[in-house]
């Protein structure tokens, strides 16, 4: 077991968990991250080694004395460890899955101890390309190692070790987070009792890899990118990152959802309805995408975008078994819940059905729900009653099996 330490150089607000004091019914309360430092080298799939690193985490609920009620939530591309509750630093910063995690919510923190981990390579507190490379004293930039989903799982396992958690009650995630949950079930089968995979896939299609490549090229060809070392130049490849986000955002929405939100509505049309016959914003959808792109470029790191999209491309557990997904999933001993959404064309329901068929072939216990929802891939983030009922029911079954009926008895500060 590795022995992480809390970073003593960080502000006091980040040196220890802030108790989640609910500010409203169903809220996980005001939360702040903990920064764990790991000095044990982490071997990576690329053959490189990361000698030391920090991971930003948040926790919700209380770890029981038996350490059996822990749930790991894995995040998608542009999310972070801030899964639920309200940030202590910004009252407007609500966790990205706050409708899913909290007291009385589908993942009920009166019963479960939930951990959110910001992945290596991200830009929200964990070690990544913008961090200082101890060998040079400068930001890593493009020299930061390329990572895989499996690398993230190995790093997350050390967080579990830190808390003394031998086996998670569940590991769950949506989209890229679902890939991490699946990887946990394959690579650490003895440590996962339940695997919850939402709006995900066992591998990216050529189309998805193509979208990622176009987004990366937008960033890399931005004159302000400087080969990934833009930190030293005091620039940000904001134009490229904005375009990358615009491309990605289109893939997260369904055609029907975009038609309902925007249709062909014009932005400030002329009184006579004539076109402007120019290349500035003409339609509402253009304005929306530009806004999303520009907002994203102000808070996300371009090198992180490159790194995470490449990790998405590389994920393919069946690659090691000649394309046989059932064989790739054979080590898994967990029970599974898979959820897909009817209008998700980024990771369509057929990809979830493929995983279900492979699991059934192996005799794995699996529950599958395909939710009829109009919102495309982003439906996994929304408060859909049918979707949440499925997840709630699954976690209630886990709670019954573990004897978690109501709030757990505190053991003390687990960190």
Curated annotation (Swiss-Prot):
Its EC number is 2.3.1.46. InterPro entries: AB_hydrolase_1, AB_hydrolase_fold, HAT_MetX-like. The record marks 346 as: Important for acyl-CoA specificity. SUPFAM superfamilies: alpha/beta-Hydrolases (SSF53474). Pathway: Amino-acid biosynthesis; L-methionine biosynthesis via de novo pathway; O-succinyl-L-homoserine from L-homoserine: step 1/1. Its main location: cytoplasm. One of its GO terms (cellular component) is cytoplasm. Keywords: Acyltransferase, Amino-acid biosynthesis, Cytoplasm, Methionine biosynthesis, Transferase. It is found in: Cytoplasm. It catalyses: L-homoserine + succinyl-CoA = O-succinyl-L-homoserine + CoA. Residues 69-383 form the AB hydrolase-1 domain. It holds the Pfam family Abhydrolase_1. One of its GO terms (biological process) is homoserine metabolic process. GO terms for molecular function: homoserine O-acetyltransferase activity; homoserine O-succinyltransferase activity. It comes from the Bacteria. Belongs to the AB hydrolase superfamily. MetX family. Transfers a succinyl group from succinyl-CoA to L-homoserine, forming succinyl-L-homoserine. Homodimer. HAMAP family: MetX_acyltransf. This is Homoserine O-succinyltransferase. It comes from Bordetella bronchiseptica (strain ATCC BAA-588 / NCTC 13252 / RB50).
């Amino acid at each position: 077991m590795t022995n992480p330490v809390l970073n003593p150089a960080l502000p006091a607000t980040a040196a220890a968990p802030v108790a989640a004091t609910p500010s409203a019914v169903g809220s996980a309360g005001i939360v702040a991250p903990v920064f764990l430092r790991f000095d044990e080298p982490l071997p990576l799939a690329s053959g490189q080694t990361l000698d030391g690193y920090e991971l930003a985490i948040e926790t919700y609920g209380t770890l029981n004395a038996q350490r059996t009620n822990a749930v790991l939530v894995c995040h998608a591309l542009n999310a972070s460890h801030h899964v639920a509750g309200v940030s202590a630093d910004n009252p407007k910063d609500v966790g990205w899955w706050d409708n899913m995690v909290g007291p009385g919510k589908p993942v009920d923190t009166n019963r479960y101890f939930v951990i959110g981990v910001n992945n290596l390579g991200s830009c929200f507190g964990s070690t990544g390309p913008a961090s200082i490379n101890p060998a040079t004293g400068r930001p890593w930039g493009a020299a930061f190692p390329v990572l895989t989903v499996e690398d993230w799982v190995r790093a997350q396992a050390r967080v579990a070790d830190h808390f003394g958690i031998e086996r998670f009650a569940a590991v769950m995630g949506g989209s890229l987070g679902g890939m991490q949950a699946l990887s946990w079930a394959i690579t650490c089968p003895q440590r996962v009792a339940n695997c919850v995979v939402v709006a995900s896939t066992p591998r990216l299609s050529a189309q998805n890899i193509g979208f990622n490549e176009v987004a990366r090229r937008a960033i890399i060809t931005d004159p302000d990118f400087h080969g990934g070392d833009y930190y030293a130049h005091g620039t940000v490849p904001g134009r490229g990152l904005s375009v990358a986000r615009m491309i990605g955002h289109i893939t997260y929405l369904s055609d029907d959802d975009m038609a309902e939100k925007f249709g062909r509505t014009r932005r400030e049309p002329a009184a006579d309805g004539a076109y402007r016959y120019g290349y500035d914003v003409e339609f509402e959808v253009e304005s929306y995408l530009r806004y999303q792109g520009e907002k994203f470029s102000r808070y996300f790191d371009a090198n992180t975008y490159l790194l995470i999209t490449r990790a998405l491309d590389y994920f393919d557990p069946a690659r090691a078994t000649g394309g046989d997904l059932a064989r790739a999933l054979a080590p898994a001993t967990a029970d599974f819940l898979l959820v897909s959404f009817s209008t998700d064309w980024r990771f369509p329901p057929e990809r979830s059905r493929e995983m279900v068929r492979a699991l059934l072939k192996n005799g794995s216990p699996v529950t599958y729900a395909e939710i009829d929802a109009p919102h495309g891939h982003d439906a996994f983030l929304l408060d859909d009653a049918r979707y949440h009922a499925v997840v709630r029911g699954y976690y209630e079954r886990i709670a019954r099996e573990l004897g978690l009926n109501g709030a757990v008895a505190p053991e003390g500060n687990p960190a």
